[in-house]
Regions:
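Compositionally biased terminal segments of proteins
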Residues: 2-200
Length: 200
């Protein structure tokens, strides 16, 4: 899998396509994360997710990390089984995301043959299995990408031999997203996020 600064061989099974995430809610399948420091240490993410972030940076993909990983970033240490990437589905960005995926998957992206498939409204693509599944989304509840993009939270990830920028959904829009989703786990996250906003 290809965006490493220094190439190291990966076994295909380290990140494999999973079209059916059944069982991903079991405690054994979840990754417990602590709040990351900044810049984020290279060991915080799994090697494959770090590799994917390098690919996104290399191709200048417009994305923001959302979901449980974003909640963790804002200080709520809890379990999550994936990293959710919210991406712009405009033509240029869909094309460069397709290119990034093609490099990451060495030219053989599971189930995807053209960048236009990344533009299907409400598209959700899942690669891998918990606790390190990659989820790609072009829509999330309560938040439009173009409205949120200027307010994104930018931090740096240690990626030898240099730092690379990564993007998180900002706290205000993460709260809007959780309010719109309103699942039990979202409501639990919401209590913490609102408390964090008041104290912050």
């Amino acid at each position: 899998m290809g965006c490493q600064t220094t190439h190291q061989p990966h076994r295909r099974g380290e990140v494999d396509y999973c079209s059916s995430p059944e069982g991903s809610n079991s405690p054994q399948s979840k990754r417990r994360s602590t709040v990351p420091s900044t810049p984020i240490n290279s060991s915080y993410f799994s090697p494959d997710i770090s590799e994917f972030l390098k690919c996104l940076h290399r191709f200048d993909v417009k994305y923001m990390i959302v979901g449980g990983e974003a909640v963790i970033f804002y200080g709520h240490a809890r379990y999550t089984g994936d990293v959710d990437f919210f991406y712009s589905d405009e033509d240029k960005n869909a094309k460069v995301l397709f290119d990034a995926l093609s490099v990451f998957w060495e030219g053989n992206i599971p189930e995807i043959n053209h960048f236009a498939e990344l533009q299907v409204p409400g598209q959700i693509l899942q690669f891998g299995r918990p606790p390190n599944r990659i989820d790609l989304l072009n829509q999330i509840d309560g938040v439009h990408f173009d409205d949120a993009w200027p307010h994104r939270k930018k931090v740096e990830l240690e990626a030898e031999p240099s730092l690379i920028p990564i993007n998180y959904l900002d706290l205000e829009n993460l709260i809007k997203n959780k309010e719109a989703s309103a699942r039990p786990k979202d409501l639990d996250d919401l209590k913490y996020l609102k408390s964090s906003k008041k104290s912050g």
